[in-house]
Each structure stands twice: as structure tokens, then as C-alpha cells.
UniProtKB/Swiss-Prot annotation:
Name this polypeptide is given: GTP-binding protein At2g22870
The family this protein is said to belong to: Belongs to the TRAFAC class TrmE-Era-EngA-EngB-Septin-like GTPase superfamily. EngB GTPase family.
The keyword Transferase appears for this protein: no
Residue ranges constituting the EngB-type G domain according to the UniProt record: 119-297
Length: 300
């Protein structure tokens, strides 16, 4: 199952994680982030009732299968400018102040029970080693060394809490899939990270980072499936989207389409997703706005 939004302890919008035979067309263009066109709901002068009903039906089907629609948004009221560029995310009434004015490192924890005990909302960042977690955090807060970046996979092996605007946390989780560690270390990572997901009541959402410069990786899909089955809300964040040309294999836009196709075949409702680049800043403001509406909905 996949939980798209979390409202304190209330679980909503649950969707069975089962294959589905019906395929939906993905309306996207990597080079033009304003890629989603909402079907227009307009009446015909000849037969207004029939045309309007058909248009509403088409729009509803499209929206439910492709877009992430937050609470407070009616499908019939959707317009193009409500969809964040480079994403499938609709902005609703819970979106608010999103800019980061101050950030401070709070602590590193080796176990979930050692994490901060206050009730501030948390948005966790997770991904394969060297997917760009630390770079994304530094991009979001616009400071170069808030999160330690390294070319050595598996550098971050603790749960790191950063307090933002004295009101919410960014949580930098250890990367998964690194090869140059012992099997015991991998087991420990799995145990304490999963413990964090399952027992952290203040967790609003997980940003699951996907490297757009490589084809879909089984370990990313396994992680997404595990999060879905355990009702952990997630947003797919495609990283390294500035690398428009492929040096080896397929282009990033082709890799993204391939990943989305697999997700559509396994999730009845597509989770929210967004394109980003820590180099160019692509998607930064849009992702922060999305994060704000998730936090505000959780905190109401």
C-alpha cells in the first residue's frame, strides 16, 4: 500500500500496491517542464450536457491516474497553473511559506530512539548512495556545507537532523546500496533505518531520491515498494536532471520515463514526483512549496 499524505496519526488516501493492467499515457517533456495539460471542461452549444459530462469524466480519469492532488483541491477546478513545473504535483490551499531562512544541525543518531524527542514535523531524505542527497540538502538551504558531500558511497551512516526555521526538520538518512561495507553494516543500516520509518510519528513524508542519469535500479524499486507496503508517504525526487546528454546508455528523460512506467504498473495511484538538479537549481523552489503543503496539512 502507499500512503500519499500523512495527517498526524490519521492515515488517508491508501492505495493497494498491486499490478494493474490498465496503462495510462504519461504527458511529459523533459526539456519543457510545463508538460502537463489539464483536459478542459467546456460545454458545447449543440449538446452541452453530454459534452460537459464527458469532459469532466476525461479530466477526472486523467487527474486520478497521473496527478498528485492534495486535500482541499477539487478535480473539476484544476487548471494548468496549479501544477508545479517539472512535476505531477498540484498545489492546494495548504501550500504556504516555503523559503528557508535559517538552518542548524541538531544531532546525529545511530538509532531511531535517539532522534530528537520534540513533536516538530520531519521530512526525511532517502536514496541510493551517491544519488545526491547531501547536494540536494545544500541546494535547498542554499548553504554549501550544511550536509557533508562525498564521492565515497556510504559516507553518511547516521540519522542526521537539521532544524529549519526553528519549526521543522530535514532528516538526512544513510544511503542504501553501497558495496564497500560489511554485510553486518548493511544489516544494521536496514534495521535502524526501517525502525525510524515505522516508529517516527513526526515523519511527514520521505523524499525518495532517484538518479535520473542511470536506468531504473532494482534497489530503488524495492525501497519504494517497501515504503508503500508500510504506509510511509513518499515523493519521488529525480536528481541530476541537468545532465541532458547521456555519456553512456540512455538520456535522463528516457530513464525517468522508464522508472515512471514501472511505478505505474505497481501503484494504483502514482505518488508525487518532481525533477531536480542541485547544479542548476532546477525544481528547488517547487520542491520547497510541495514540502510546505505536506507539513501544513500534517500540522493542522
Amino acid at each position: 500500500m502507499v500512503l500519499l499524505l500523512r495527517y498526524r496519526s490519521l492515515t488517508i488516501n491508501l492505495t493497494p500496491l498491486i499490478p494493474k493492467s490498465q496503462k495510462f499515457h504519461t504527458l511529459q517533456s523533459f526539456r519543457n517542464p510545463n508538460f502537463i495539460s489539464i483536459p478542459k471542461i467546456s460545454a458545447s452549444t449543440n449538446n452541452p450536457t453530454t459534452t460537459t459530462n464527458r469532459s469532466i469524466s476525461d479530466a477526472t480519469k486523467f487527474a486520478k491516474s497521473v496527478l498528485f492532488i492534495p486535500p482541499g483541491v477539487e478535480i473539476e477546478e484544476l487548471t494548468d497553473d496549479m501544477v508545479l513545473p517539472g512535476s505531477n504535483i498540484v498545489i492546494g490551499p495548504f501550500a504556504g511559506h516555503s523559503q528557508i531562512k535559517e538552518v542548524e544541525f541538531v544531532k546525529s543518531s545511530a538509532r531511531a530512539r535517539d532522534c530528537p524527542k520534540d513533536d516538530r514535523p520531519e521530512i526525511a531524505i532517502l536514496g541510493r548512495s551517491n544519488v545526491g542527497k547531501s547536494s540536494l540538502i545544500n541546494c535547498l538551504v542554499r548553504k554549501k556545507e550544511v550536509a557533508l558531500t562525498s564521492k565515497k558511497p556510504g559516507k553518511t551512516q547516521l540519522i542526521n537532523h537539521f532544524l529549519v526555521n526553528k519549526s521543522w526538520y530535514i532528516v538526512d538518512l544513510p544511503g542504501y546500496g553501497f558495496a564497500k561495507v560489511s554485510d553486518a553494516a548493511k544489516t544494521d543500516w536496514s534495521a535502524f533505518t526501517k525502525g525510524y520509518f515505522l516508529n517516527r510519528d513526526s515523519l511527514v513524508c520521505v523524499l525518495l531520491l532517484i538518479d535520473a542519469s542511470v536506468p531504473p535500479q532494482k534497489i530503488d524499486l524495492d525501497c519504494a515498494n517497501w515504503l508503500g507496503r508500510n504506509n510511509v508517504p513518499m515523493t519521488f525526487v529525480f536528481t541530476k536532471c541537468d545532465k541532458m546528454k547521456a555519456t553512456k546508455g540512455k538520456r535522463p528523460d528516457e530513464n525517468i520515463k522508464a522508472f515512471q512506467q514501472i511505478i505505474r504498473e505497481n501503484f494504483k495511484v502514482h505518488p508525487p514526483w518532481i525533477l531536480t538538479s542541485s547544479v542548476s537549481g532546477l525544481g528547488r523552489d517547487e520542491l520547497l512549496l510541495h514540502m510546505s503543503q505536506l507539513r501544513n496539512y500534517w500540522d493542522q
